[in-house]
Amino acid sequence: MSNLQPAPPETEGTSLGRARLGVFGIVFFVVAAAAPLVGMTGAVPVAIVLGNGAAVPGTYLLVGIILLLFSVGYATMSHHVTNTGAFFAFIGRGLGVAVGVGSAFVSLVAYLAIQLAIFGFFGVVMAGEMAARFGLEAEWWIWVLIAWALVFVLSWFSVDIGAKLLGILLILELLSLAIVGLAVLFSGGGPEGMQLGDSFLPSAIFAGAPGIAFAFAFASFIGFEATAIYGEEAKNPKRTVPRATYLAILVITILFAVVSWAMVSGIGSSVIIEETVGITGELADPAALLWAVTDQYVGSWLTEIMKVLVLTSLFAGLLAFQNSAGRYFFSMGRAGVLPKALDRVNKYRAPSAGSIATTVITGIVIVWFAIQGLDPFANLFSWFSALAVVAIVLVEMLVCVAIIAYFRKTKEDTRPWNTMIAPILALIGLVAGEYLLIAKFALLAGTAADGSDPTVDSFALNTTGWILVLLPFAILILGAVWGKARVSKENEDLIKDLVS
């Protein structure tokens, strides 16, 4: 690790490309990271069966509202802090450099973890599709390493190149989901029609096992906070970033709430749990639920297209999180928290050193999982996706506290709703969400203790589960200690370089 150094003047080698992204370019990266088609085929069916049944759409809506409340303060803060470190910088400004550094390490681990999780899911789906469609039998890790190399190549170029590719893939993905939702809506739903109350009334949302549904819903939103990461590359970031944040959350919320409602209504709200169990083979193939609804209300032709789009959705997520992790490495290197060499950019103004670091780390983990013979879904995907969502929600909680502290201290914005009320409401929702995530971590990560039932028991984790769930908190503490140690050796003036 290098010592903290003042941020150097912007030169060709240490500054990102300016004014490359507009609102929609940033939204493409963020919504692509959420991988809505993957969520519809994976998280939604599981939440229906193990969570609160027909009320899963309302759960997504409620989580979306919590995150919109979070975004009020987040967007307000982005007017005062424009930095590729985003959360790192926000928390540093509000709670001090030590906590800011700790949160930076937590965020970085979260982005690396979710990318690894997507690699695992991609390997499973790609291996299955290639074998079924073309008879090409190959180990999951072969397809993963091909995607790993391609993601690195694309991340090497200007950020707007990646945005254009993600835009094309995302439009196809959203269009396919919209067709399914509208088809069910215009047909009036299944035998029971379009039941609003069964899906959106509070009494329905908090029935059954809502904790499981909320855990999966929060997991489906991971990546939305990445809007501010692109602040330095945005056109007019003080306007672009807040707009992109609100728009991204609205798109994700509406998409998950409406399409999952269409899935529930298409089958029938009173029988959705039993039918989902039967259609998916007791969740052995959760994607079968969406395929069944699509077959019935649109046609098998769209189902076949969507099976391919699941792969493009996963690939889009890989590229989005590659960009996020690379930019965190860049920001932390520029601040001196990590080696200064990480703040280098290439001729395309992309964070080349950060991208290399991300690629090397993920490559090592993928190869290790392959050598050990671990399962790409049960281990690589489940472990790292659960770890990532706990880490991100932890950092979001700190951001809420930092926003309140920052504006109380500086008085730069005195609007109560933006700087106090909305952040407090969001904090309450996020704390509740984090509790549910940890309580049901065994179900999310597949790390239940021997003899326990993760669908019923809370906090029943094996050793691996406890290591994963406590890791973000340990990293926060160790990172804060590291940050304080670095600053204590330096001039107080360097704090601004670290958090701005």
Q: Which residues does each PLM region occupy?
A:
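Transmembrane helix-loop boundary segments of multi-pass membrane transporters
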Residues: 46-57, 124, 128-140, 160-170, ...
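Membrane-interface "cap" regions at the ends of multi-pass membrane proteins
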Residues: 1-55, 67-68, 72, 194-203, ...
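Helix-loop-helix junctions that connect adjacent transmembrane segments
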Residues: 12-19, 57, 133-139, 168-307
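TM-loop-TM module centered on a large, flexible mid-protein loop between adjacent transmembrane helices
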Residues: 89-90, 96, 128-132, 244-319, ...
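Extracellular loop-to-transmembrane helix junctions
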Residues: 41-140, 463-480, 487
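A generic transmembrane alpha-helix motif of multi-pass inner-membrane proteins
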Residues: 43, 62, 387-395, 417-500
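Membrane-helix boundary/coupling elements in multi-pass transport proteins
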Residues: 83, 106-121, 221, 226-234, ...
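Membrane-interface loop-to-helix entry segments
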Residues: 140-191, 244-253, 391-394, 409-428
